[in-house]
Curated annotation (Swiss-Prot):
GO terms for biological process: mRNA processing. This is Oligouridylate-binding protein 1B. One of its GO terms (molecular function) is mRNA binding. It comes from Arabidopsis thaliana. Its main location: nucleus. PANTHER family: POLYADENYLATE-BINDING PROTEIN RBP47B (PTHR47640:SF9), TRNA SELENOCYSTEINE 1-ASSOCIATED PROTEIN 1-RELATED-RELATED (PTHR47640). It is found in: Nucleus. Coiled coil: none annotated. Heterogeneous nuclear ribonucleoprotein (hnRNP)-like protein that acts as a component of the pre-mRNA processing machinery. Functions to facilitate the nuclear maturation of plant pre-mRNAs.
């Protein structure tokens, strides 16, 4: 009986320890009680009180939608006081004013993302642009790996434990009306922004662990002011302006197939062109056609053969983001690839040096390995003599053409020869 009690006590202690360990992953700001009435994700300023609002903003409206049709659709959630449609060339937007707040809230919850003429509309609270603080001179951080249920309000609650947090926005897809899985948070004080990056990265928000970094190039060196004329972070990434109007640009990098270049920032001074090529080649995102590094400025570019490959490289590059001890920042290059640019894939980079073996040793071994694969033989990697076979292959290939087997191409073995 005594032994059973001891086992139960041990189990309780273990459960308490596990609970404490789990809670340590959460930031105090993430443990805030849920709101009584959820606020949908969108362009909503922190501190905005929807209980005083009876109007909704409607964006991404198909050009065939008329004002009477828009009013008819939104009248389904409650009596409409007035409706205004503002027509644009590619997509329109409008405002619907209800007699009561509950009808407006129901419209947001039930109509956001619904399709009109095959195009999903965006519905959110309408507000005057003066209700949002000007954050153009604030310090902005990027927040990635957001779960689909995270809203602007949840994101702001998470970071509002820092006194100078001024704004928080989740980016959402123009076509689907869904979260794009990342957002931006603004701070009046640079130190608060840096502390947030250090403390909240890896913490849980919703169902995922989030990651944080500076949203602009050069932020860690004090050059973190936005240098995008008067455009906000939201305009530049999601096509939504400060006043809730649609500014979608079909030529934005994510929408333009001519963009095939990845910008890589925050590179360590010792990172060379070969190092960057080797890192992105190891990701296996696609065919690399050009690699450039500005070592004195700490950034570089990697050009792929297609837009899709470049997009995948950005995603993977920000996931596997450390090179020479620094966390890289990957995004779209500033210019599209000129039409008619010839496709010339780069040969695979030379393998990284291994202590005890020279580059020529590695090249010779790779050549022997490739030849054995082509002949249907077992790779020398399984040779019982191990490194002896490695050295033997290297010595036997002295003076001959050297080759690298590109293991990234599983369907077609390629030999890239060097004199």
């Amino acid at each position: 009986m005594q032994r059973l009690k001891q086992q139960q006590q041990q189990q309780q202690v273990m459960m308490q320890q596990a609970l404490m360990q789990q809670q340590s992953l959460y930031h105090p700001g993430l443990l805030a009680p849920p709101q009584i009435e959820p606020i949908p994700s969108g362009n909503l300023p922190p501190g905005f009180d929807p209980s005083t609002c009876r109007s909704v903003y409607v964006g991404n409206i198909h050009i065939q939608v008329t004002e009477p049709l828009l009013q008819e659709v939104f009248a389904g959630t409650g009596p409409v006081e007035s409706c205004k449609l503002i027509r644009k060339e590619k997509s329109s937007y409008g405002f619907v004013h209800y007699f009561d707040r509950r009808s407006a809230g129901l419209a947001i919850l039930s109509l956001n993302g619904r399709h009109l003429f095959g195009q999903p509309i965006k519905v959110n609270w309408a507000y005057a642009s003066g209700q949002r603080e000007d954050t153009s001179s604030h310090f902005n951080i990027f927040v990635g790996d957001l779960s689909p249920e995270v809203t602007d309000a949840m994101l702001f609650t998470c970071f509002s434990v820092y006194p100078t947090c001024s704004d928080a926005r989740v980016m959402w897809d123009q076509k689907t009306g869904r979260s794009r899985g990342f957002g931006f948070v603004s701070f009046r004080n640079q130190q608060d922004a840096q502390t947030a990056i250090d403390e909240i990265t890896g913490k849980w928000l919703g169902s995922r662990q989030i990651r944080c970094n500076w949203a602009t190039k050069g932020a860690t060196s004090g050059e973190d002011k936005q240098s995008s004329d008067s455009k906000s972070v939201v305009e530049l990434t999601s096509g939504v302006s400060e006043d809730g109007k649609d500014t979608t640009n079909g030529e934005a990098p994510e929408n333009n197939a001519q963009y095939t270049t990845v910008y890589v920032g925050n590179l360590a001074p010792e990172v060379s062109q070969v190092d960057l090529h080797r890192h992105f080649h190891s990701l296996g995102a696609g065919v690399i056609e050009e690699v450039r590094v500005q070592r004195d400025k700490g950034f570089g570019f990697v050009r792929y053969s297609t837009h899709v490959e470049a997009a995948l490289a950005i995603q993977m590059g920000n996931t596997h983001s450390y090179l020479s001890g620094r966390q890289m920042k990957c995004s779209w290059g500033s210019k599209p690839t000129p039409a008619g640019t010839a496709s010339n894939p780069l040969p695979p980079p030379a393998p990284a040096p291994i202590p005890g073996f020279s580059a020529s040793d590695l090249l010779a071994y790779e050549r022997q390995l490739a030849m054995s694969k082509m002949a249907g033989m077992n790779p020398m990697m399984h040779h019982p003599q191990g490194q002896h076979a490695f050295k033997q292959a290297a010595m036997g290939a002295t003076g001959s053409n050297q080759a690298i087997y590109d293991g990234g191409y599983q369907n077609a073995q390629q030999l890239m020869y060097y004199q």
